[in-house]
UniProtKB/Swiss-Prot annotation:
Residues 429-448 have a biased composition (Acidic residues). Dimer of alpha and beta chains. A typical microtubule is a hollow water-filled tube with an outer diameter of 25 nm and an inner diameter of 15 nM. Alpha-beta heterodimers associate head-to-tail to form protofilaments running lengthwise along the microtubule wall with the beta-tubulin subunit facing the microtubule plus end conferring a structural polarity. Microtubules usually have 13 protofilaments but different protofilament numbers can be found in some organisms and specialized cells. SUPFAM superfamilies: Tubulin C-terminal domain-like, Tubulin nucleotide-binding domain-like. This is Tubulin beta chain. Pfam families: Tubulin, Tubulin_C. It is found in: Cytoplasm, Cytoskeleton. It comes from Epichloe typhina.
Amino acid sequence: MREIVHLQTGQCGNQIGAAFWQTISGEHGLDSNGVYNGTSELQLERMSVYFNEASGNKYVPRAVLVDLEPGTMDAVRAGPFGQLFRPDNFVFGQSGAGNNWAKGHYTEGAELVDQVLDVVRREAEGCDCLQGFQITHSLGGGTGAGMGTLLISKIREEFPDRMMATFSVVPSPKVSDTVVEPYNATLSVHQLVENSDETFCIDNEALYDICMRTLKLSNPSYGDLNYLVSAVMSGVTTCLRFPGQLNSDLRKLAVNMVPFPRLHFFMVGFAPLTSRGAHSFRAVSVPELTQQMFDPKNMMAASDFRNGRYLTCSAIFRGKVAMKEVEDQMRNVQNKNSSYFVEWIPNNIQTALCAIPPRGLKMSSTFIGNSTSIQELFKRVGEQFTAMFRRKAFLHWYTGEGMDEMEFTEAESNMNDLVSEYQQYQDAGIDEEEEEYEEEAPVDEPLE
């Protein structure tokens, strides 16, 4: 079995993580104590991807929960699914990182990191064939961003050949929690570019928009936002957790989605989007799912793919779906919107099918796109970063923890490089490459 070890760091990561475990426990027929009382054999078949079987028919998530302050952990432990997790897997400090990336990455976080790695090692040893790691965190804070990226690079060192997927909540343009978000995010992206294999970008503002516009919620809570994120996370990992005709795992996903190793930042979407109560009022069809899935309003990152082009994308359908119908729809999308797909990667939509729909739905689809328009997101953070860094605002918080201004400059230029790489592939066409060769061809001049 191909197991995945899940890490959640910081407040945001722990809250999203908790929502994710709640969602997939439900899908696998586990109650809040991890005891199986499901109905279908299929729920058990690949349970071991995310769960360890303990004694007495109890299943325990392969999850490591990390934070630098006890608050969020206590909330998870007191929450509806608090009894699900193994008590030894809660690793927390007391001091907090105070939204300071340097504290999470260099001082406070570094003290805790060995303790976390011990737990990760123990989880990894309990696996038959570890496929990789997934980590949920935000990029705007101190613990999730600073310590999260520290853990990623440490795990990278120890398990260099395993996949590393991150679900990263990027700071959004209008909804901001702290003033130093641009610093934390830029320093984190600098790390993710090098150390992660696939990063699913999620953004609070886009989630708010989906809640307001599509789900008609007048004032969405973080619970509603986390519910959306967990729907996507559950969709991305469906193929790993249930048997299907066309399965993909983290590695296949990466092979199909990442044309150039640095460009692994994906936009995600989910269809059908229904608010938590309103599942049962309408039937959905494959064309409808496809249309909703490719709708920019459905993307969970605040960048509009119509401003860029898709390098690759992947569609994961769940439920009783006809293979042929899916393929026809995908071909249809590509033919009608060919300007939004780069022409130098033929058939760049990958599809996967899984027979088991999410709870309460007949069928659903998850969309993962590697679009060049994700650069908008980095550009936006980069502009805010430059505005503050030019004045050296708030820098003493970071230099006081032993960081150097050089690191900021490096992170900034690495992020700018990323943006221009995306831009370069957005502009690249097929003809340009041929023209270059023509220029280089020797001209047949008569010899003097």
